[in-house]
């Protein structure tokens, strides 16, 4: 059993579509002996439209690709300078439900930002994490065969202007903020390390393997 083993993959900057496909493939082929994994990645510019997504929230996507995906939620933007943390966990083995995993993700963000004296918080009616009514992180998950994929997006040091082309997560006029502006993590390496540190505690992982990329590539 791989209950307390965690693999953390640093994937660098990647196009969205191949990583989404790899998440699905991993989830479809894993078994009860597969270790849980965290994937840290930075995406090329893309809008992703969740399963509940409505086209009216895509105001003016322009030259940025729009991809309809299988996570929950509405439309959001991913791009350079934003830290993605994908959580490929066997929820049945962890004995948690999707709601508890959402709470874990929110707490990882809140706890890592608290180390910089940033007071972040979650909202019951609007998933994600906020600072002074501005959104700093988005969440979206899918569970298949009792296992999760997708995860969180933390705004770190990025061009926030593409968010003006959409209603982020379906909320018109939602203001976005990033850690750089708040004297938090200034780069993805620092931001990602903080998120992973807090998730390791929640998983009670005793064997953590850090690696870059995928095997056989």
Swiss-Prot record:
<keyword id="KW-0963">Cytoplasm</keyword>
<dbReference type="Pfam" id="PF21948">
    <property type="entry name" value="LplA-B_cat"/>
</dbReference>
<dbReference type="GO" id="GO:0005737">
    <property type="term" value="C:cytoplasm"/>
</dbReference>
<feature type="domain" description="BPL/LPL catalytic">
    <location>
        <begin position="32"/>
        <end position="207"/>
    </location>
</feature>
<feature type="binding site">
    <location>
        <begin position="151"/>
        <end position="153"/>
    </location>
    <ligand>
        <name>substrate</name>
    </ligand>
</feature>
<keyword id="KW-0808">Transferase</keyword>
<comment type="pathway">
    <text>Protein modification; protein lipoylation via endogenous pathway; protein N(6)-(lipoyl)lysine from octanoyl-[acyl-carrier-protein]: step 1/2.</text>
</comment>
<feature type="active site" description="Acyl-thioester intermediate">
    <location>
        <position position="169"/>
    </location>
</feature>
<dbReference type="GO" id="GO:0036211">
    <property type="term" value="P:protein modification process"/>
</dbReference>
<protein>
    <recommendedName>
        <fullName>Octanoyltransferase</fullName>
        <ecNumber>2.3.1.181</ecNumber>
    </recommendedName>
</protein>
<comment type="similarity">
    <text>Belongs to the LipB family.</text>
</comment>
<comment type="function">
    <text>Catalyzes the transfer of endogenously produced octanoic acid from octanoyl-acyl-carrier-protein onto the lipoyl domains of lipoate-dependent enzymes. Lipoyl-ACP can also act as a substrate although octanoyl-ACP is likely to be the physiological substrate.</text>
</comment>
<dbReference type="GO" id="GO:0033819">
    <property type="term" value="F:lipoyl(octanoyl) transferase activity"/>
</dbReference>
<dbReference type="InterPro" id="IPR000544">
    <property type="entry name" value="Octanoyltransferase"/>
</dbReference>
<dbReference type="InterPro" id="IPR004143">
    <property type="entry name" value="BPL_LPL_catalytic"/>
</dbReference>
<dbReference type="InterPro" id="IPR020605">
    <property type="entry name" value="Octanoyltransferase_CS"/>
</dbReference>
<feature type="site" description="Lowers pKa of active site Cys">
    <location>
        <position position="135"/>
    </location>
</feature>
<feature type="binding site">
    <location>
        <begin position="138"/>
        <end position="140"/>
    </location>
    <ligand>
        <name>substrate</name>
    </ligand>
</feature>
<keyword id="KW-0012">Acyltransferase</keyword>
<dbReference type="InterPro" id="IPR045864">
    <property type="entry name" value="aa-tRNA-synth_II/BPL/LPL"/>
</dbReference>
<feature type="binding site">
    <location>
        <begin position="71"/>
        <end position="78"/>
    </location>
    <ligand>
        <name>substrate</name>
    </ligand>
</feature>
